[in-house]
Amino acid sequence: MGEASSSSGHPRQNPHVLGYGFHGAMPNSLPSANLFEQQGGANYFGELEEALMQQVATLRRTQQTATTTSTLHHGDTTPFSTTATAAATARPPPTLDIFPSWPMRSLHTPKEGSNVTADTTDSESSSKNNSNQNASSDQHVLVGDMAGQFDQIPQQEQHKKMATNSPTHSSKTGKALDPKTMRRLAQNREAARKSRLRKKAYIQQLESSKLKLAQMEQDIHRARSQGLLLGAPGGNTSSGAAMFDVDYARWLEEDSQRMAELHGGLHAHLPDSDLRAIVDDTLTHYDHLFNLKGMAAKADVFHLITGMWATPAERCFLWMGGFRPSELLKTLTPQLDPLTEQQVVGICNLQQSSQQAEEALSQGLDQLHQSLAETVAGGSPLDDPNVGSFMGHMAIALGQLSNLEGFVIQADNLRQQTIHQMHRILTVRQAARCFLAIGEYHNRLRALSSLWASRPREILVADEGNCGELSIAAHPSESQYSAF
């Protein structure tokens, strides 16, 4: 009976077992049941267990490799290597496709008379399936975490760059700054930038002033060595006068160069176009001299009118701080031959108009001298001891002295206009010869001054003896009027 019951109960269990093993099989499929009986349930579950263990071992090796890689890179500051990144982000090896895509429990509930072995097999396969699913889910979670770390690294770097470059974040607190603070920071940066620019400009100005001062010292030393600067009595030379002396010494050097160019151009028979360029440059050079004298007249008019900037021989021919235009024309006319009739008439008219202007300026200067002398002589402290009255007369005298500046400037304008008129009347080559004659005339006067200053000592002693004899001869005449 037991055997019969077991044999009779066995066909009832086959549909359930086949239902768990094969999804598409029918419960009453006899060929499938016979095949399962021939192979044996033990062999089937043994192969299933072996495949699951291989899969679990593969998952454990993958997990250990990922853990080792993450530990190494957490201890190092260098970024992950390309191999580790590829291994971490790679997909897990494919699993055996031996499980159904739907839940393992069959929709058909087992009957009450099922075999205990079938239930045990069902529980074992379910537990192994759950462990396989848990291992797969753990592997996916681990790979997802590592991929997230790899994704977070460039995102963190990008956020750092944005925080560094963005003006709305503070480098210390990491909080957004309000517009008022941002505006104040921008103003501070702009003020610092302007301060640096001002400091740089100030340093450059100091350097240029230092170089200019050194150049001025060299020019003054050179001018004094040439006997051009004798200085005012007592050393009361103003800064404007000293500046003009330096500029005039430099102008003389440049004038010598232009005279050499004119001399070379005339002897080389340059074309009129090339020679005209040299003549025009020389005329501009004289205009620059008159501009310098105008600034010096405003700074210290007495320095110009007394001729302290010129040599002693030049002072003998000085008129209101310069040469007389009419006298210069008389000196130049014989050296400009041959002249056309029209040129002679033009030069004569220019000379006549220059003389008239000179006389007018001389009369005005004489009147100024007379009025100035009367102002200074009036209001003597002996007659009027009032200090206020005396200071009033001094104020009037100062106002009259300011007119002296105007006379010197008008005289320079007359000299400048005379040179320009001569440039218009003469041809290019005649104008070149004219400028050469003017330069040579003043060079000879300066040479005469140098010779006078460097004359031998015996001549100086003889001059002193002559002066002594004159003074002795003058004493008897003075003694004749001693009674008076």
From Swiss-Prot:
Return the InterPro entries for the record.
bZIP, bZIP_sf, TGA_domain
GO BP terms, alphabetized: defense response; DNA-templated transcription
Please verify whether the record's keywords include Signal: no
Region entry Basic motif: which residue ranges?
A: 180-200
| Record Pfam families | bZIP_1, DOG1
According to its record, what are the GO cellular component terms? nucleus
Quick one: where's region Leucine-zipper? 206-220
Name this polypeptide is given: Transcription factor TGAL4
The organism named in the record is Oryza sativa subsp. japonica (Rice)
